[in-house]
């Protein structure tokens, strides 16, 4: 099959832990061909289909120079057997617009994974609300007092931004509450943004659950 991955720049990948890289490696091992593009490479024009400026790539197996890329070319998304949207957060306006272009490509016959509407309706952090049986005590709020009460109840907590990924912007606050106020102000931008707060679970060192 011909697969198109919509990703961040390949040069930014940390291949020792990147899920998209693992998917590419397994796809190539199974004999599928790979192409990549960035979300900003998506194009639509009246009277035409959604296209993208794509590069065909081959994984080399080398840990440093891990891919070889062909020159950019224009291709309709319907020319691929599957299009995989793998752009990392944040879920900003450009990400939102990209999902609409991908939804148009679906109407034209492209097979897009995950479904663009699902990406809009299920932000990565908040999707866990649909699976409460798999999560520990969790709070989503922008109110510092809510966070203080949650800390008083659970003592050892984790605070994280809703639009982060890869461990960025995550803080742990222990029973002493050291810097809880300043961390809250940093993450919620003085009350302008909601944050997620969770009880710290030592079992996290044994792994987590992924819902696919």
Describe each PLM feature range.
Residues 1-4:
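Extreme N-terminal starter segment of soluble prokaryotic enzymes
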Residues 61, 161-163:
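Short acidic, glycine-rich loop/turn motifs
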Residues 35, 112-113, 158, 196-198:
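Structural detector of well-ordered beta-strand residues that form the stable sheet scaffold
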Residues 13, 26-33, 152, 158, ...:
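Extended hydrophobic/aromatic-rich secondary-structure runs
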Residues 11-140, 146:
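Conserved N-proximal alpha/beta basic substrate-recognition cap immediately N-terminal to
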Residues 20, 145, 152-156, 163-212:
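Phosphate-binding site of ATP-dependent enzymes
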Residues 7-8:
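Extended, domain-scale alpha-helical bundle/helix-rich regions
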Residues 28, 106, 151, 187-188:
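N-terminal cationic-hydrophobic initiation segments that often serve targeting/anchoring roles
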């Amino acid at each position: 099959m011909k697969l198109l991955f919509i990703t961040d720049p390949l040069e930014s990948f940390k291949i020792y832990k990147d899920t998209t890289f693992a998917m590419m490696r397994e796809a190539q091992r199974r004999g599928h061909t790979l192409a990549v593009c960035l979300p900003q490479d998506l194009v639509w024009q009246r009277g035409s289909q959604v296209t993208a400026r794509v590069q065909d790539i081959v994984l080399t197996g080398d840990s440093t120079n891990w891919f070889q890329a062909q020159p950019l070319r224009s291709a309709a998304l319907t020319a691929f057997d599957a299009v995989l949207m793998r752009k990392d957060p944040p879920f900003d306006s450009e990400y939102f617009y990209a999902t609409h272009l991908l939804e148009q490509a679906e109407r034209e016959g492209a097979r897009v994974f995950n479904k663009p509407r699902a990406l809009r309706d299920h932000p990565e952090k908040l999707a866990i609300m649909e699976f409460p049986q798999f999560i520990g005590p969790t709070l989503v709020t922008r109110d510092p007092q809510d966070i203080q009460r949650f800390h008083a109840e659970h003592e050892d907590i984790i605070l994280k931004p809703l639009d982060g990924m890869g461990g960025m912007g995550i803080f742990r606050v222990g029973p002493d509450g050291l810097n809880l106020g300043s961390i809250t102000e940093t993450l919620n931008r003085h009350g302008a943004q909601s944050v997620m707060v969770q009880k710290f679970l030592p079992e996290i060192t044994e792994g987590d659950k992924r819902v696919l």
